[in-house]
């Protein structure tokens, strides 16, 4: 009974991550729209950039998921069950999260270079502020997507379905 409660607690974090994944693109549109309006940039360029950003983030998210799946498969089920009973699964999740952060930062920087290359050529110094917003807009959904996949795979591994 205690094990099932802890498993349901981890599952609730998975639902929270899913909601954040769905909300993040709308927050991204608001931030970029406001920033570009203040700088009098072309809004069509902004919406085209948002579509590119979402497509590339989904692609990078799948690559991140495969990397995380490979890392999770190396963890024994007994060790995972023991960690959930003793530490609510935090030891295992933190071990995977360190790897997840590195992979997410790498792909975020790669996507940032691809997306901002032409923007820096057109807008020069004023694009510096956009670099920060764009990096956050790539990294946060990618990290949340990775966390969601990570927790889902962990739950299936615990139940013995992988």
Curated annotation (Swiss-Prot):
Keywords in alphabetical order: Cell membrane, Membrane, Transmembrane, Transmembrane helix
Main location: membrane
Keyword Membrane appears in the UniProt entry: yes
Domain of life assignment: Archaea
Gene Ontology, cellular component aspect: plasma membrane
Localization, UniProt: Cell membrane
Disulfide links within the chain: none
Transmembrane regions: 10-30, 50-70, 96-116, 125-145
Topological category with respect to the lipid bilayer: Multi-pass membrane protein
Keyword Mitochondrion: no
Name of the molecule in the record: Uncharacterized protein MJ0792.1
Lineage of the species this protein comes from: Archaea, Methanobacteriati, Methanobacteriota, Methanomada group, Methanococci
